[in-house]
Amino acid sequence: MAKNLMLWLVIAVVLMSIFQNFSANNINNRKIDYSTFLSDVNQDQVREVHISGREMNIIRKDNGRYITYIPISDPKLLDNLLVKNVKIIGAAPEEQSFFTAIFISWFPMLLLIGVWVFFMRQMQVGGGKGAMSFGKSKARMLPEDQVKITFSDVAGCDEAKEEVQELVEYLKEPSRFQKLGGKIPKGILMVGPPGTGKTLLAKAIAGEAKVPFFTISGSDFVEMFVGVGASRVRDMFEHSRKVAPCIIFIDEIDAVGRQRGAGLGGGHDEREQTLNQMLVEMDGFDGNEGIILIAATNRPDVLDPALLRPGRFDRQIFVALPDIRGREKIIQVHMKKVPLGNNVDPMIIARGTPGFSGADLANLVNEAALFAARNNRDVVMMSDFESAKDKITMGSERRSMVMTEKQKESTAYHEAGHVIVGRLVPEHDPAHKVTIIPRGRALGVTFFLPKDDVLSINKNKLESQISTLYGGRLAEEIIYGVNNVSTGAHNDIKVATNLARNMVTQWGFSKKLGPLLYSEEEGEIFLGRTVTKSKHMSDETARIIDEEVKLLVEKNYNRAKKILEENLDILHAMKDALIKYETINSRQIDDLMKRKSIQSSNICTDDDNN
């Protein structure tokens, strides 16, 4: 289409240039009246005259040129010119041919008609490839041999994989289900945090199903033209009916499926009209037998309730973050293309990466391979995975950043305060590593690693986290005094305050207020939430909440302070170790907490991960 349009533009430019040339022969000659010409002749200013019919091209003695026309027959003109010794040159008048005259007269109209016919033909071109095909669906149909991903490439989400495997089996062998009265699900909504493998599952379905597979993003429906979204939905389902049974996959459906009548735009914006059309196509008067709609989102809370009901999305599959066994399987899948050293153990890596999604683990393996290549190794060692994990969890090292000895000492005391309080309060995650090498925005980082996957947190553990967060600030206060505390604890204070407020207002950990919900998470109006907010508490209750939050923070603040004051010798020893080695691991932290000296700066051993 682009080539055809360019060809038409070139033809139009050429024809217009030809048209301009017909009338541009004498564009440099100005026209004057006949009386001025006679005056120039009488004043002996004319040197040469070219006569062609009634048109005369005059050349003055000063080389000036102009054109004039003889209004009537002037029998004395030639005599006057001869008297003034003007050179007279005669020429036959130029006459346009009949075809040239017709062309010049009709060319503009023919050009307009040609442009109109061109666009009308393009509007009739199917497949969404025409110049005016704004309403054509952008869904791409993937050939069976194009998608190479299968269920063997998907790991860490066994329950979700079983659900979609049943769907593929139905498409391959529908009679086995139909003889028992079972019907194929019309829609499946895959829900889960980012990076857990929702889109990968859809690709695996495409690789296993052996049926036409259409894929489109939720943002591809709505554009700047009114009515385009609804038209694209109709066109997509129309194409799907022709090749049923088939699968339609809509990625990030929250872009078009947000709740109607909420947020900005009221009930008449283009997105809502697109959603209305999708609701009708999914379960309206027109049957869609054999069309299975699969959608993925990480924001199910903003979707319209009508979109989620049975008959449209019959199933909701939650794709959760992988547990330790799932992480091990995911790591093994990504390690297939990486040459590994003998000391690499996927289970140890999985144990040290709680909370990592499938995408995070893929990035971890890739970063480890890059570290090995950077160090000119032929295989990827366990130390490369450790360095990659540190980079992902704590940020990249900024060794080029210049820190004074005073800043290093202050940072070392700050991080040591976190570690000591974290090791001595109950039920806190063990400290895995601490460093005073600047990473990301932080001057130092303390990394706590849970022993097991965290499914829920009790009150004691939450209070221990608050105490540990204030450990860094308190270490500075004890060593340097209240007036010399730095701003390094800004984020620690923010996190601790939010934890304490949530404990009081959302999790029911306040005896005075009881197990009641006093605040809800605020939703963004652009994500389907209302603009207005209602207040669920009185001013007196708000005052009590502030008091309870303050009491909770002060309680754990004082506990952390007492712990550090009782272990000042460990605080000084850990500061010295951090300044000497810059980074210490969990085994070295154990030695320091037992008041033992440490000799080695080795921070990447297999024993640490165990």
From Swiss-Prot:
Keywords: ATP-binding, Cell membrane, Hydrolase, Membrane, Metal-binding, Metalloprotease, Nucleotide-binding, Protease, Transmembrane, Transmembrane helix, Zinc. CDD domains: RecA-like_FtsH (cd19501). Zn(2+) binds at residues 414, 418, 492. GO terms for biological process: protein catabolic process; proteolysis. InterPro entries: AAA+_ATPase, AAA_lid_3, ATPase_AAA_core, ATPase_AAA_CS, FtsH, P-loop_NTPase, Pept_M41_FtsH_extracell, Peptidase_M41. Its main location: membrane. The active site is at 415. Homohexamer. This is ATP-dependent zinc metalloprotease FtsH. The lineage of its organism: Bacteria, Pseudomonadati, Pseudomonadota, Gammaproteobacteria, Enterobacterales.
